Amino acid sequence: MAVGKNKKLSKGKGQKKRAVDPFTRKDWYDIKAPTFFENRNVGKTFVNRSQGLKNADDSLKGRIVEASLADLNKDDEQAYRKFKLKVDGIQGRTCLTNFYGMDFTSDKLRSLVRKWQSLIEAHQDVKTTDGYLLRVFVIAFTKKRANQVKKNTYAKSSHIRAIRQKMFEIVQREANSCDLREFVAKLIPEVIGREVEKATQGIFPLKDVYVRKVKVLKAPKDDLNKLLEVHGGAAIAGAEDAGVKARNTEFKEPAPLASV
């Protein structure tokens, strides 16, 4: 019998490494919406704890969350509007967000498109008074004139060009005369859509006129003071305490002992 290693013998296995739950190394942060909206508690997000050169705040800044206007303003009729919010600052365990865009849900857009009518779209780059460069998309549909017998409501190319020009003028006027906060306040009740519908009555009657999308192309440099103004100017509840300044006490040397 040959003496040597028996390959059939099972090799003793070492102790298995204990699985660690990755969530034990993460912290949860609250997401706060600006004061444009009624319900400011958007939700929560998590991030790895600060460790070494990796700071948790740096990982959170720049995150983009999406919320329905039905949840933000507690109005189910506005569920087709989606608002994007970007995390621009951290205060304690709270993420302070700012407006980053608006869009319609796909089912709402599909419900607007129908036969026998013309769809008119326009987009315009505008700048607010506080330095935000926005791209605003407007959509509209033609409707029947009073006492019209004809089935379709197709607009001529000249009508479409004239309506689109009115859209450009109104969007430019409404955006250039206000800051971002006031512009968002105009988006929610559809002020721009009503202005376009009123201004184009003499060209061709319109219906379902909406600002369907807004993109933030360029934002000014981050400023914590301006961000706090958007959030009401006060410190967010739950933030870390700033601390108390230590008293300036001078050191006094103790008197020497007579004997030890």
Curated annotation (Swiss-Prot):
The modification N-acetylalanine is found at A2. GO terms for biological process: translation. It is found in: Cytoplasm. Pfam families: Ribosomal_S3Ae. Belongs to the eukaryotic ribosomal protein eS1 family. Component of the small ribosomal subunit. Mature ribosomes consist of a small (40S) and a large (60S) subunit. The 40S subunit contains about 33 different proteins and 1 molecule of RNA (18S). The 60S subunit contains about 49 different proteins and 3 molecules of RNA (25S, 5.8S and 5S). Coiled coil: none annotated. The keyword Cell cycle does not apply. The keyword Ribonucleoprotein applies. Its main location: cytoplasm. Keywords: Acetylation, Cytoplasm, Ribonucleoprotein, Ribosomal protein. This is Small ribosomal subunit protein eS1. GO terms for cellular component: cytosol; cytosolic small ribosomal subunit. GO terms for molecular function: structural constituent of ribosome. It comes from the Eukaryota. InterPro entries: Ribosomal_eS1, Ribosomal_eS1_CS, Ribosomal_eS1_euk.
